[in-house]
Design a protein with these regions (language model features):
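Sec-dependent N-terminal signal peptides
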Residues: 3-13
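Scaffold/interface architecture of coatomer-like assemblies
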Residues: 16-379
């Protein structure tokens, strides 16, 4: 048996019964409180190397394992505290991550381990991380390790979002708005239209998994930050539900919060009987492209983003050619395992577009660079 507890910056998780909820609130208001330490527990830490994520941050984390036999006793409240101190550069400021967790009574018959994990993002540099677990009955454990955060040899030319020595939460609000971009020096006169397929897997799955949405949002953010683009249009849709969930005409930014609302409209566990009709999904894509591109003479670049796991029947070539061939450059960021077997993949190929499979920040940066370069040349 293994229980997993996750620690993130700014998060408070309460497990078990709510009997200690008032105590937890009181403890959260006492950051200076020191728990008495009388019995040291056996615990060990496993860490993972910092990796460059699609937000262009070095992301690192850890797992701490404690045998359940060490936790035998009545229900209690634990305080987990992670202190990350920059070693170099020395001028950087340390950060403290704290979380209170309530656990129910642990009987003597229970076996296995409890795993407590957490993560954070840093800029390049060296850090000392110290993790403490204490509880009000005096049990405690502490582990420490060093973190050496740097870009790999192949990523040396990839710019980072965090300064050396900077420490930030691993998790960010997925649909936060972007800061304005100064587009004056680069012209900012290219128009970008994005088709975003919000399906991330089987329609039988009851929930939408945010970590599968995150790479698609990262593509949109990287495109938005390019100063060559000045206006943006978005069509967010579900191929499985066969409907448009959100649409915005050309404007000076993407409305990420509205896109988040569109994601919450998804109902992947619900299947309409009309969705089961033969070729219904390919017909939906054909109609979507026809309606959206017929009268759009503003787009300089058309970008499709999404997962397409369904290997549907190919739209007949004669029907693809009947669609108005976009005057814009066409690109597809496809996160599926077999991208060219998807309906959209076949259409993009017929249109002579470029397709990308993104697995790293470097690949994302290179793909967006190609989108900009090809669009400027074609224009």
């Amino acid at each position: 048996m293994r229980l997993v507890i996750v620690l993130c910056l700014g998060a408070t998780a309460v497990l078990g019964q709510a009997g200690n909820a008032t105590l937890i609130r009181e403890l959260e208001q006492r950051p200076d409180l020191t728990f008495i330490r009388t019995k040291q527990l056996s615990c060990k830490v496993k860490k993972f190397k910092p990796r460059l994520d699609l937000e262009f941050r070095l992301h690192t984390g850890y797992w701490v394992e404690i045998p359940f036999k060490e936790l035998i006793g009545p229900e209690t409240v634990w305080r987990m505290q992670l202190v990350v101190e920059p070693i170099s550069p020395e001028s950087a400021q340390p950060e403290t991550i704290e979380q209170f967790v309530e656990t129910g009574a642990v009987p003597e018959t229970v076996k296995g381990t409890v795993e407590m994990s957490g993560s954070f993002a840093v800029g390049e540099g060296s850090y000392r991380a110290t993790w403490h677990l204490t509880e009000r009955f005096g049990r405690y454990c502490s582990v420490a390790w060093d973190v050496d955060a740097k870009r790999g040899r192949r990523d040396r030319d990839v710019p980072l979002a965090l300064e050396p020595g900077e420490i930030r939460p691993a998790r960010q609000y997925l649909f936060r708005q972007e800061e304005p971009v100064d587009r004056s020096l680069a012209g900012g006169d290219l128009n970008l239209k994005v088709f975003l397929n919000l399906d991330t897997g089987s329609r039988r799955r009851a929930t939408v998994r945010p970590w599968l949405i995150a790479p698609m949002v990262a593509v949109m953010r990287t495109l938005f930050r390019r100063p060559e683009f000045g206006e943006f249009a978005l069509v967010a849709y579900s191929q499985e539900d066969q409907k448009i969930l959100y649409r915005s005409d050309y404007g000076d930014d993407f409305d990420f919060q509205a896109m988040g609302s569109a994601v919450r409209k998804l109902a992947p566990a619900t299947v309409d009987f009309r969705d089961l009709a033969r070729d219904s999904e390919s017909n939906f894509i054909e109609e979507l492209l026809s309606d959206e591109l017929r009268n759009d003479d503003r787009a300089d670049a058309i970008v499709f983003i999404g997962y397409e796991h369904w290997e549907g029947k190919k739209i007949p070539k004669e029907r693809v050619t009947q669609l108005d061939l976009p005057r814009a450059s066409v690109f597809y960021f496809n996160f599926a395992w077999h991208p060219w077997n998807s309906t959209l993949g076949k259409v993009v190929r017929e249109w002579g577009g470029s397709q990308f499979r993104i697995r790293s920040a470097r690949e994302l940066l290179q793909a967006v660079e190609k989108v900009v370069d090809d669009t400027m040349v074609a224009r």
